[in-house]
Amino acid sequence: MALAIFAINALLNISLFRPGAMPYRDSIELGYAAMARFFYLHPSPWGWNPWQYCGLPSQFIYLPGLQYMAATLAHLLPIEPTYLYRLLAATLACLGPSTVFLFMVYFTRQRWWALATALGYTLFSPLYSMVATIDRDRGNIQLPWRLLVFVKYGEGPHNAGLTLLPLALVAVWETCTNPKYWRLLLAAVLLAAIALTNWIAALALAFCALTMALTVIQLPGFRVERMAIAGLLAYGLACFWLTPTFIRTIAFNWPADAFNYHLQSQQQVLLWGLAGGLVVVRLAFKWLFPDELFTCFVALNTFGFGWVVLWFYQRGVNTLPESRRYALEFELFFLILIFEYFRLLLRRPRPVAIFCAVIPFVFLMQAAWPDAGRYLTQGFERRNPVPREQTIEYKLAAKLASLKPQGRVYASGGLRFRLNAWFEIAQVGGGFESGLRHRLPLVLAYQVRTGVNSGPGQETADAILALRAMGVEYIVVHGTKSREHYRDFTNPLKFEGALELVHREEDDSIYRVPFHSLAHLVRWDERLQWPRESKLPLLRPYVAAMDAFPKLTSAWSGSEFRISGAMEPDRLVAVPMSHDGGWRAKQGDQEIEILKDDLGFMMLRAKPARSAEIVMSYRGNAEAFAMAALSLLVWLGAFAWLRWPGFLGRFPGRARGLGPGMAKL
């Protein structure tokens, strides 16, 4: 049945498996696909990515799950990694109802109710009837909300994590009620897989584990400590990527990425309300329905995710960072709860129970049938991808590639997500900021688009200074009539007459910025500085030094960055590339010191020479290698211990009367 459910979902959404650009232009799907392409070409997780955000460690790009899988398969199959990412993400999105079916079968032992729930999840999104903002967001294409966010916004990793979530919950229950080690290992692998795929799904999984423990508190035979052991083992399996520094970086960046979230008094009240509500729901089930543990578990998750999501959509308040994104989890458990309500009422059919089931069912069908009917009959014409060559983003990217830039490009809007999915071109921006160790270049990029901190008449001059300081050679500006979705320049005409126009495509323009090299000599007082009392960094001396002689040349050679030229006394070599402790620089046979300026870029203390070459190489850092070694030991040990299933102890078996799931039948 699970395979049949997947087949139905795949046939209903066959357009998701086709190559090309999705009809929605605000999708960030190609931002994820660009990572798959990068890891296909540069598989080392401890390398350096020079193509985005003025450079960052490969490990800090994003969570690797789907992207590394697509990159690995691309070495085995004659398919582009970007398209393989699409196929993987679409497959996992269509598998969602199948894992819901398995989840329901496991916990209720009733296949037909499980099938009904899975089909309901396939065809119906209750969120459209509950949240006006979500209802307006679907436009002229009818898809379940989980698939619409995949198509419209590119939420492939979130859908993948959502698909794995029911399986992980089954595995966690199994390991807490059964002493066999292989169950614990399976649970740990699933937990690690979700944590390496999507942060939102990982946090949702942690919340579900909490509600599971709350549901079965004081239940004989359920060993919560095994849940904790599975979590620790999962971290050991995943710590090769989820290093302490990586987690800390994500944690500190997340509030800024989530529209400047702050834990203020309002958020604290809502969090206390969430905790209190969970206790109330659990006590209500304890007093009214003490035997219905599965229904209690689903109700707790429905309340928890619903609390976070509905406060955001109804009042505009974020209980957690990016509260709106938990709508997928809320809808999943809310729909399961709806079918669980009907299942329990009709388990022992009586007149009152039948009445209480039939009336809500009529209202449910009245709300669901129009959307389901439209979904089944709409066809694929409006959903089919279009050839990428027809999109304005690809035309601009291809033109940039033909210019063969030696410096960076400044690409904003949707182009910054898509550019590196097609071409290896260094850019100021990229796909996702969550892994950035320093964010000051983002401030400069925002200044270029908006001119917000410039004085009267200084907007263009300040923007050009910022571009040159970041090593930009070409900038793409989207006009007010551009087909690009994110037209984010406050004044798209600001560079007319100030920069050389290289190319114009419809209402999109490419300008050349004065550029010599990604390395130049500066005196100490010419370095990049940002005085505390100033809204903008001090850029003019740094940029003026670029035009002075002697000039340096720079180029990438494989994984090395080479700088050549005359090194003058009392001068530093300024390199507008993100500073990281994993960099090493050698001038000849001698290692030279790497400094950091106020914007987080590198400066090299070169030795005076009429002609010299500096070779910079990125070797990673000790923490990354130590955590990788630890993870390898955990993987080897975890599978070696399969030979000794009693190593972690044999805990009491299942709770009496519960069968393989929570529901008493």
Model feature map: region roles:
Residues 429, 536-654:
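Active-site-proximal, structured, solvent-exposed surfaces of multi-pass membrane proteins
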Residues 494-501, 585-590:
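A SAM-dependent methyltransferase catalytic signature shared across enzymes that methylate proteins
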